[in-house]
Amino acid sequence: MEFETVIGLEIHAQLKTNTKIFCACSTQYGAAPNSHTCPICLGMPGVLPVLNKKVVEYSIKMGLATGSRINQWNQFARKNYFYPDLPKGYQTSQFDLPIVEGGHIEIEVDGVSKVIGITRMHMEEDAGKLVHDDVEPVSHVDLNRTGTPLLEIVSEPDMRSPQEAYAYLKKVHAILRYLDICDGNMQEGSFRCDANISLRPMGQEKLGTRTELKNMNSFKNVQAALEYEVRRQRDLLLEGEKVIQQTLLWDPDKNRTEAMRGKEDAHDYRYFPCPDLVPIEISDEWIEEIRASLPELPEQCKARFIVDYALSEDDAVQLTSERDLALFFEEVVAAGAHPKKSANWIMTELLRELGGESIVDCRVQASQLSALLLMVDQGMISGKIAKTVFAEMMAEGTDPQLIVKEKNLLQVSDEGELLAIVDEIVAANVQQAEDFRAGKTKLMGFFVGQLMKKTKGKANPGLANELFNKALNK
């Protein structure tokens, strides 16, 4: 029997505000445990929350960027449950009156475009964090994160494969980063994702029993967890067993999911309107003001790169997948490097050297990479030497001109100097020279290689080919 995979994602994006959603405590990551707390964060009796206006503004920005409807009358609600990292016994969230509804995200997988619907986005406060002791069988509670503003983005169950879910997650991440409302750091927990997944017989409309996947702290883990859960549910169904509705944790060390608890429904949380916060009313004027302030988004940036820099669509897609990468590319070009050559170097040499790290952590500045590419264009160094220089730039952050000077790597373009070596090589390889003249033109690589050995890779390759052609065709 064939099954269809149905996936919906719930993305929790920490909004990049200086203070928390309902109090003036800092949202700084990495502070000493429980140092950024106050009676409001901790849910002490008699305190009242005050809504951070920036949280509303950032939520509207994301709604506008995804073609969603902004609910100009929305309301906070209490989501009631007990957990050690939730000191109030409830989370202030939104339920039946969220700030954003509808909208969509367009993704592309294997060259095929698809629109993924958005159900809703709502504002809420983050919970604290449990830190499990490596030695003692205890867990410590850090409440610094409590009250950090979150925007939860809930998709429609429109994804039909882990690959589509991965593409959707990356696209949402990119939009948040372009809007500069979330830093998107999955390792620090500022961009988190839960997945609801079920299988149903191909052609059936009714959804199957779903499970919820948690603890996926990287894009790679999201795809791996979804692929595992698809296989697990398919195996159960093929064996005639039932899928149990439950919450599962992904264990990246064991590459498998483990049961956490039964999956809750909305009624389990006993939502009711928050009595401490009045409903929010958003004016048309404020929405239009925010709309006018929206920056260029990934799709717009991609279209501009194709037109302004004559890049292919594939190159433009890759360069605009991350806001910082797009900015780096434009800085390289602005410093004088050729757009296409800049794109090629960034997508091959630079990304390979980074090895999955963010461009923000790159030790090479855009102006330095531009200077290196200009040295190649001007014939000062060869492309091969440039790769060696670039590796040292990545390691030390040194200017390319200094590396080339200190290591005496300037390209040899003196025709007289090279011609003497060319004649010497031809004279020493009589048989290869005769074979070349007989039609084995691929031997040109052999001759140029000999020249590169003698010049330690510094010979101008274009001039080398020209000189060998003359010498071998006398």
UniProtKB/Swiss-Prot annotation:
Reactions catalysed, as given in the entry: L-glutamyl-tRNA(Gln) + L-glutamine + ATP + H2O = L-glutaminyl-tRNA(Gln) + L-glutamate + ADP + phosphate + H(+); L-aspartyl-tRNA(Asn) + L-glutamine + ATP + H2O = L-asparaginyl-tRNA(Asn) + L-glutamate + ADP + phosphate + 2 H(+)
Class in the EC hierarchy, top level: ligase
Domain of life: Bacteria
Record-level Gene Ontology MF annotations: asparaginyl-tRNA synthase (glutamine-hydrolyzing) activity; ATP binding; glutaminyl-tRNA synthase (glutamine-hydrolyzing) activity
SMART domains: GatB_Yqey (SM00845)
UniProt keyword list: ATP-binding, Ligase, Nucleotide-binding, Protein biosynthesis
Gene3D superfamilies, per database record: 1.10.10.410, GatB domain, N-terminal subdomain (1.10.150.380)
EC number assigned by the record: 6.3.5.-
Short name of one Pfam family: GatB_Yqey
GO terms, biological process: glutaminyl-tRNAGln biosynthesis via transamidation; translation
PANTHER family, alphabetized: GLUTAMYL-TRNA GLN AMIDOTRANSFERASE SUBUNIT B MITOCHONDRIAL AND PROKARYOTIC PET112-RELATED, GLUTAMYL-TRNA(GLN) AMIDOTRANSFERASE SUBUNIT B, MITOCHONDRIAL
Quaternary structure, from the entry: Heterotrimer of A, B and C subunits.
Family under the similarity heading: Belongs to the GatB/GatE family. GatB subfamily.
Function description: Allows the formation of correctly charged Asn-tRNA(Asn) or Gln-tRNA(Gln) through the transamidation of misacylated Asp-tRNA(Asn) or Glu-tRNA(Gln) in organisms which lack either or both of asparaginyl-tRNA or glutaminyl-tRNA synthetases. The reaction takes place in the presence of glutamine and ATP through an activated phospho-Asp-tRNA(Asn) or phospho-Glu-tRNA(Gln).
Record-given protein name: Aspartyl/glutamyl-tRNA(Asn/Gln) amidotransferase subunit B
